[in-house]
Amino acid sequence: MQKFEKGFFVGAATAAHQVEGNNIHSDYWAQEQLPHTSFAEPSGIACDHYNRYEEDIRLLADAGLNAYRFSIEWARIEPEEGKFDPAEIEHYRKVIACCKAHGIEPVATLLHFTSPKWLIAMGGWEAESTVEYFKRYVSYVMEQLGSELSYVCTINEANMGLQLAAISKRFRLMAEQAAKAAASAGKSAEGSVQVGMNFQKMMENMKYAAAENAAVFGTPQPKIFVSERTPEGDLLVMRAHAAAREAIKAICPEVKVGLTLSLHDLQAQPGGEAFAAAAWEEEFTHYLPYIKEDDFLGVQNYTRTLYGAQGQLPAPQGAELTQMDYEFYPQALENVIRKVAADFKGDLIVTENGIATADDTRRVAFIEAALAGVQHCIADGIPVKGYFHWSLMDNFEWQKGYAMNFGLIAVNRETMERTPKPSLATLGGYANA
């Protein structure tokens, strides 16, 4: 094992809705309660991280890690439009202070998929007003907490909506062919987006969803952040990021600002070159004009995607698959970093990389291979400044519920007892104090 240089972030990541619990004012909480929800189960108290963050941060620090990426929940800070909750600001102030007390660098994400329910009722992530609402929220958070932070991610996986639009279109086309084809297609389609989605269940529930969503959000097709996005909505997200960056720099000019992107290692088989090139343009290249002023880019990668002469291909026959049906392919991270660095000349931080598996020996192997790739990139002069493993603990994987084991720490669903896995110590061993 080769340790990273001093100052390199070796950390773990979480998202508020997936770990905190009782995020009752959010759009996701509302969707989880629908009679015909696409969620396998509701988030409930999640991992109770809201009340147990001190224990979780201590476990992270005791293992040798030196950084923690977490998200600040907009729906807690602004549960009603224009009404901010100072008690929730104080909660996150305590989280940041706890990190620093344990020698942990706090890296805050201001939007990790979930939004306040009221925002979605006002048009959500296809409405121009959302840009100003987001800027106002970001300004409030930075006025209160900005002096205590050095790194801020504005938006997590800003490209997720376009990825979902492409995958949903492909899934619907395959599902129309036959029930048998739909079953197998559902597996491969879900494996090509880096978030837990139940596409088959979503299609089955469509006839009920419109009325139920209208009753909750005032619209039959709520534009939550993780939903199919139009090109106009894609640009709106970029404007929201730019507005947030401007607000952060005006209040705390020394804070380093960036966003994160979900990036696959897109590999072309003979005849698939045009498909792979088009996918990379949509997934990454067209965002370059909007992130050129950022201090860093958050790279989030879990696997590769193959393309042939007819388009996207399934994982190779006999390939090891994770619980998410992703191909076990840790070398994807190095490939993505190198491809990104060819066009983006700022600092890079791996803000997510991980594996869903009940076999922690495979997680250890994944970490070791992925970090070897990161070290190869650094040796070649690529400015990679940190690595955050997804995730600190087993948690709520969105529509898939609690069945996915992404964590470095196991969480007993009955007692909430934490049990560090060997992979946590493995990751900590790479950090230089």
Annotated model-derived regions:
Residues 1-37, 81-82, 89-363, 372-433:
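Active-site region of glycoside hydrolase catalytic domains
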